[in-house]
């Protein structure tokens, strides 16, 4: 055996003995950094800290924006057979009734409406309930979405993480507003609302303006324990 090979053999023997002395049974007991359950970050996290970490830039021009840039409205991105709007209504309303195909929500109750804190009855065709994008599509367009793939824009427009059933007139008063220009009248919901916007912007790597980040800080400073919501759909919608 060459001197080099003799050295390697002795080193391996020493390592084995060291593991035995420390109570380890072998290298298989050491954590594998490639395993997702070892490397995954802890769930939750502070919404305020996440807001601090968002990229800050100026708002880009709205040139080229139209609703169709984010795909047809309320497509079935999760492939459960139902459109996104009906999925959100079924998930966020109480006392839901559906048609015979099991998808279309015919009636229900939004209690409370997060934006106003009131009780709203939903009836299909005479609805006072909208499905709002927490981060408006046009706001996203001006803060990074112009450069996305079509699939990513479809995913964003239909991601449950970015969608909330809310009073229609209040939602329409929001328009394209971000945190700096609009907050829900229901002050009890503002921390959750802003945390939702932060989560969506973090997930989709959208930037914020300085005024927007300052407004996020101001709201979340009043609820520093507010957790960052997570989940929703993948950030690339399947091809249709």
Task: Map each language-model feature to its residues.
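Bacterial N-terminal signal peptides that target proteins for export
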Residues: 1-11
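Hydrophobic helical h-region of N-terminal Sec-dependent signal peptides
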Residues: 12-17
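C-terminal motif of bacterial Sec signal peptides marking the signal peptidase cleavage site
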Residues: 20-23
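Bacterial signal peptide processing site
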Residues: 25-28
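N-terminal low-complexity, Pro/Thr/Ser-rich intrinsically disordered segments
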Residues: 32-69
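Acidic, divalent-cation-chelating loop motifs in proteins
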Residues: 74-78
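Acidic, glycine-anchored loop motifs typical of Ca2+
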Residues: 79-83
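Domain-level detector of nuclease and nuclease-like folds
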Residues: 114-240
């Amino acid at each position: 055996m060459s001197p080099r090979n003799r050295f390697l053999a002795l080193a391996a023997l020493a390592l084995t003995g060291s593991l035995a002395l420390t109570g380890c049974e072998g290298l298989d007991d050491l954590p594998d950094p490639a395993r997702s359950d070892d490397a995954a970050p802890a769930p939750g996290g502070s919404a305020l800290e996440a807001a601090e970490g968002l990229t800050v830039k100026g708002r880009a021009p709205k040139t080229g924006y139209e609703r169709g840039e984010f795909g047809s409205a309320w497509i079935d991105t999760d492939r459960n057979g139902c459109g996104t709007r009906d999925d959100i209504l079924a998930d966020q309303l109480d006392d839901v009734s559906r048609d015979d195909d099991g998808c279309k929500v015919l009636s229900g109750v939004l209690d409370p409406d997060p934006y106003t804190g009131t009780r709203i009855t939903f009836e299909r065709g005479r609805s006072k309930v909208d499905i709002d994008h927490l981060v408006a599509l046009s706001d996203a367009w001006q803060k990074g979405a112009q450069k996305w793939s079509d699939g990513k824009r479809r995913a964003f427009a239909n991601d449950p993480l970015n969608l909330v059933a809310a009073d229609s007139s209040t939602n329409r008063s929001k328009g394209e507003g971000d945190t700096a220009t609009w907050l829900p009248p229901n002050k009890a919901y503002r921390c959750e609302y802003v945390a939702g916007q932060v989560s969506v912007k973090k997930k989709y790597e959208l930037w914020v303006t300085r005024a927007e980040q300052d407004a996020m800080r101001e709201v979340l400073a009043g609820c520093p324990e507010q957790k960052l919501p997570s989940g929703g759909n993948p950030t690339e919608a399947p091809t249709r």
